[in-house]
Structure formats: structure tokens, C-alpha cells
Amino acid sequence: MISEAPPFWWRKADWRAWMLAPLSFVYGRVAGHRMAHARRASVSIPVICVGNFTVGGAGKTPTALTIARAAKAKGLKPGFLSRGYGGSLDVTTVVDPHHHRAVAVGDEPLLLAQEALTVISRRRVDGAHRLVAEGADLIIMDDGFQSARLAIDYALLVIDATRGLGNGHIVPAGPVRAPIGQQLRSATALLKVGGGQAADRIVRMAARAAKPYFTASLKVRGDDRLTGIRVLAFAGIADPAKFFRTVESRGAEITVAKTFGDHEHLSEDEIGDILTTAERQDLLIVTTSKDFVRLSGHHGKAQELAQQCRVIEVDMVFDDHLAPGLIIDRAIVACRERRLREMKTKS
């Protein structure tokens, strides 16, 4: 799966999108067929998948964290399941946030592991069974909606209200991962993040398909203001512009903005450039939680940068504060129904 979205994907379709359209047709046919017809393995506990329609960030990880907190408030033991993208380990592993580094397990799993039991696995079915063995009673998948490997009881698709579906084309002509119709049929509900209008069309399509949708927004954690402070902001995430807007919303003046690839581990030269630039211009360094965990556990310049960073942490806040609990309850009911169907089939 492509993880880096070229800029033209997020603009009106141009000659590049149309030139790649034949490849998109083939890719879409394969992806749609897999989602519709693949045999999915089953586990004995509820599975919630937090996915999205497109390649790139939409807020899946903050959403997964919010659902996990709601699960713990209900007395459940949630477990996160991640592929561990960006990490080097290719074996099923329980992530230890005090031992592992992002270079081994990926940045998002490290963030998830700070909240709840987290397993990474290139084979999601193996990872799900490991979570069951570790005592989890609810699995929250961070991504993996289109993989069609594991039976899902509740599929929540997150869509950014500012970016929407981009140019609307399927990979590689655009950011869409599979035919929208098939994705909607496989989804349980949508979560629209932010106040833009780019997601309105897909929300209307979901409504016609009788799919409920929730609304939410990313809120900066705490009351820390940066009013009037000149900063160097850097981000290696799918949508760095969103982070820069968040920094400015705190009152900061972004004097220098540096962007890197999603999940990218910075080189010594890149780190040195950030440190030197900030010192020369007397700038406060600010970054994202994901970028910070990629620096954690290292020595030398990476450690120095981590010590100097101000981390802007955000939470996914549902407009209806009862929504995360409702999602969990419906996943539990759906799991019971799935298990009953499986028992009848076996008998």
C-alpha cells in the first residue's frame, strides 16, 4: 500500500490523474473484489477498525486513542492492533513504550502503547490472536480497513473535512484506497473531522446508504499558549499543513517551517540543521507527538533535539461525548451476533 500521497492527489484532477486512470481501474477492481469476497479470520472478542477512505492521515490514531479511553472507562481492557508501519520488526510483538524505539516498532504504535496494550504484526490475524492471549477484551485496529484479513465488528471511517477525498481518484491516480461504493458497504459509520466542506459529498453518500456519521475535531491538549512566540515548527506527518495551522492557532509566529516525509526518521544532518537554525534565530522548536517519539530513546543530536522540543499534543474530541461509548456498545453486540452465526454455521 502506498503511504505517501503526492500533492496532485489533493487538487482537482489534472493530466497526471487521467494518465494514471487505467492503472487505477485495475487497482480498484482488485481492491474492491478483495474487500467484498475475501475470507476473513475471526477472533472471540469485538474488533473495532478505525480506518479511512484514502491514503494518508485523517486522524485515525487520535480517534483510536479516544475510543480506547472510553473502553477503559467502561472497565474493558482494550488492545491496539497495528501493522507497525515505519518500524523494522517483522515479527508479532507486544510494544513496550519504555523499551522499544520507533525505528523498530513504528511511531504510531509507540504512541498507542502509552495508552493501552499494543501489538504490531505484519499479519493482522496473528496480531489479533496475540491480543486475545494477552488478555484484551476489545481490539481497536489502527488502519487495516481495506486489508480484508480479519472480521470487523464495527468499521469507523475517518474523513478530514478539509481534504475530503482529494481528487476522488483511486490509487495511483488519486488517494482513494478502493471503490467508494464498496468501502461504504463495508463501513459501519463515518467520522467527519473538522469544519470544512470537502467531506460533504461523501457524508451525503453515506446518508443515502443509511450509514450514520459522527463529527469531531482535534483539540490541543492543555491551555499552553504560544502567543507572540517565534517558532521553528517541523513535522513528518501525512498532513503537515494541519499541524502548522494548529501551531498558529495557539498564537505562535511560525518563522521557519520544515516538512519531512510521513514516518520519516530524521538524519543527523537534518537534526543539526533544525538545532542550528533555531539557535541562530532564537526560535522555540515545536513538533508533533509522532515526530517526538521518533526522537525518543536516541542519543547525540536526536536526544538534544528531543530535549529542546515543545510538543503540541492533540486529542480527538467527539461533538457527542457519548459517541465513543456507543461505538463500543454496538461493536460488542455485533460481535455476539457474529459469534452466534459462526456457531450455527459449524453446527
UniProtKB/Swiss-Prot annotation:
Where on the tree of life does the source sit, at the highest rank?
A: Bacteria
Report the SS bond pairs. Answer: none
Known catalysed reaction(s)?
Answer: a lipid A disaccharide + ATP = a lipid IVA + ADP + H(+)
Keyword set, alphabetical order: ATP-binding, Kinase, Lipid A biosynthesis, Lipid biosynthesis, Lipid metabolism, Nucleotide-binding, Transferase
Q: What is its EC number?
A: 2.7.1.130
Pathway linked to the protein = Glycolipid biosynthesis; lipid IV(A) biosynthesis; lipid IV(A) from (3R)-3-hydroxytetradecanoyl-[acyl-carrier-protein] and UDP-N-acetyl-alpha-D-glucosamine: step 6/6
The terms under GO molecular function for this entry are:
ATP binding; tetraacyldisaccharide 4'-kinase activity
Q: Which InterPro entries does the protein's record reference?
A: LpxK (IPR003758), P-loop_NTPase (IPR027417)
A GO term from the CC aspect: plasma membrane
Residues that bind ATP: 54-61
Q: Which Pfam families match?
A: LpxK (PF02606)
Query: Which family is it part of?
Result: Belongs to the LpxK family.
Q: What is this protein called?
A: Tetraacyldisaccharide 4'-kinase
> Where does this protein come from, organism-wise?
Rhizobium etli (strain CIAT 652)
State the taxonomy lineage: Bacteria, Pseudomonadati, Pseudomonadota, Alphaproteobacteria, Hyphomicrobiales
